């Protein structure tokens, strides 16, 4: 490396599944002396979160096109052109050696702007099915990486960068050794919650009685309703919280997780080494199903598509897993994980910047 520090622009926005992996890579490279800036949108979570991590952020105006009316679709080319022009001006000022696209609407115009300026584009696809933006950008990218096999036919599988506190958890055989008593079930619907989990799990608790103890993240604004649902079936002892700030501590507590299967959730559960019941969000491209499938194939998880996520099916599944079976599943989950995903992505960014 020359005397001048290398410069990276991270393009990621919208959801934690895009932003948190980008932050992990950014911090890794900043620790090596890189200068990092972020490209995002002013009305999504990155606007608040990224500056809290000590990273400067620039904004462009762009939003998704899916589900919009005809008027919005007709205006889309002009909106994309304007966003491309904004991104291009930002990159001309910052002069990054490489840009890293981690997903979200911002990556499209940002990637095109970088390509038009001759700046190498590195892509990371977090999901088992590639999003539309990354499908387009892959044609102009210098390098494409994927978290799960199958999103792109020839891309290297590098996993998803996950938070260091999750990676620091003791291995399952250490963490779960000597545990007895009720099976500890962690229910996580994401920050928005998941209605199907909130409605079904209190009934599951009623069936399983004192063989389980549940910690249930309900999502915003429904904690009291979910608490009442548990109390209404004679199970008021279970813990319900709106959010869980320290997910690593929650994973450390749990014997099994019941949750959606967003890319980052699946990767964190594998890294922690936890068995899971996954309930994929119903989306036309079945993205969350494909995210969870490698863990089910490894014997570390069970997938219930939402129509099959019934009280009977879930209660029977949980009742059928002994502590020995759960430990075996936990070890299989950990074996599938790629704990050095952050280093792999950062290493590829560094390689591209040198060439």
From Swiss-Prot:
InterPro entries xref list: GlcNAc_MurG, Glyco_trans_28_C, GlycoTrans_28_N
UniProt pathway annotation: Cell wall biogenesis; peptidoglycan biosynthesis
Annotated keywords: Cell cycle, Cell division, Cell inner membrane, Cell membrane, Cell shape, Cell wall biogenesis/degradation, Glycosyltransferase, Membrane, Peptidoglycan synthesis, Transferase
EC numbers: 2.4.1.227
Record flagged with keyword DNA repair: no
One Pfam match: Glyco_transf_28
Classification via SUPFAM superfamilies: UDP-Glycosyltransferase/glycogen phosphorylase (SSF53756)
Keyword field contains Repressor: no
GO cellular component: plasma membrane
Membrane topology classification: Peripheral membrane protein
Residues the entry annotates as binding UDP-N-acetyl-alpha-D-glucosamine: 15-17, 127, 163, 191, 244, 263-268, 288
Catalytic activity: di-trans,octa-cis-undecaprenyl diphospho-N-acetyl-alpha-D-muramoyl-L-alanyl-D-glutamyl-meso-2,6-diaminopimeloyl-D-alanyl-D-alanine + UDP-N-acetyl-alpha-D-glucosamine = di-trans,octa-cis-undecaprenyl diphospho-[N-acetyl-alpha-D-glucosaminyl-(1->4)]-N-acetyl-alpha-D-muramoyl-L-alanyl-D-glutamyl-meso-2,6-diaminopimeloyl-D-alanyl-D-alanine + UDP + H(+)
GO molecular function list: UDP-N-acetyl-D-glucosamine:N-acetylmuramoyl-L-alanyl-D-glutamyl-meso-2,6-diaminopimelyl-D-alanyl-D-alanine-diphosphoundecaprenol 4-beta-N-acetylglucosaminlytransferase activity; undecaprenyldiphospho-muramoylpentapeptide beta-N-acetylglucosaminyltransferase activity
Domain of life where this protein originates: Bacteria
Annotated compartments: Cell inner membrane
GO biological process, one term: cell wall organization
Listed Gene3D superfamilies: Glycogen Phosphorylase B
Top EC class, one word: transferase
Xref: NCBIfam families: murG
Function, as annotated: Cell wall formation. Catalyzes the transfer of a GlcNAc subunit on undecaprenyl-pyrophosphoryl-MurNAc-pentapeptide (lipid intermediate I) to form undecaprenyl-pyrophosphoryl-MurNAc-(pentapeptide)GlcNAc (lipid intermediate II).
Entry's family note: Belongs to the glycosyltransferase 28 family. MurG subfamily.
This protein's name: UDP-N-acetylglucosamine--N-acetylmuramyl-(pentapeptide) pyrophosphoryl-undecaprenol N-acetylglucosamine transferase
Native species: Salmonella gallinarum (strain 287/91 / NCTC 13346)
Gene coding for it: murG
């Amino acid at each position: 490396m020359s005397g001048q520090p290398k410069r990276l622009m991270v393009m990621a926005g919208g959801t934690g599944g895009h932003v948190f992996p980008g932050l992990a890579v950014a911090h890794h490279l900043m620790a090596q002396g890189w200068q990092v800036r972020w490209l995002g949108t002013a009305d999504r979570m990155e606007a608040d979160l990224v500056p809290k991590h000590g990273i400067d952020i620039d904004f462009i105006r762009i939003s998704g096109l899916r589900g919009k009316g005809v008027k919005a679709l007709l205006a889309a080319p002009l909106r994309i052109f304007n966003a491309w022009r904004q991104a291009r001006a930002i990159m001309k000022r910052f002069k990054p050696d490489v840009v890293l696209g981690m997903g979200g609407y911002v990556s499209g115009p940002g990637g095109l702007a970088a390509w038009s300026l001759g700046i190498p584009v590195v892509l990371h696809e977090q999901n088992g099915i590639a999003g539309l933006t990354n499908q387009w950008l892959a044609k102009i990218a210098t390098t494409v990486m994927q978290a799960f096999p199958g999103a792109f036919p020839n891309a290297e599988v590098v996993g998803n960068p996950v938070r260091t506190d999750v990676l620091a958890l003791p291995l399952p055989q250490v963490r779960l050794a000597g545990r007895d008593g009720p099976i500890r079930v962690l229910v996580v619907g994401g920050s928005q919650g998941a209605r199907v989990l909130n409605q079904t799990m209190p009934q599951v608790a009623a069936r399983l009685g004192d063989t389980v103890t549940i910690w249930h993240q309900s999502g915003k604004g429904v904690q009291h309703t979910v608490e009442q649902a548990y109390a209404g079936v004679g199970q008021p002892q279970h813990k319900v919280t709106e959010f869980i700030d320290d997910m690593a501590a929650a994973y450390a507590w749990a014997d099994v997780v019941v949750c959606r299967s967003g890319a980052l959730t699946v990767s964190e559960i594998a890294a922690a080494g936890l068995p899971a019941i996954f309930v994929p969000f119903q989306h036309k491209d079945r993205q969350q199903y494909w995210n969870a499938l490698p863990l089910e194939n490894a014997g570390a998880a069970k997938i219930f598509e939402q129509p099959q996520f019934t009280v009977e099916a879930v209660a029977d599944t949980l009742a059928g897993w002994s502590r020995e079976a759960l430990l075996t599943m936990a070890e299989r989950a950990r074996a599938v994980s790629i704990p050095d995903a952050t280093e792999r992505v950062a290493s590829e960014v560094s390689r591209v910047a040198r060439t």
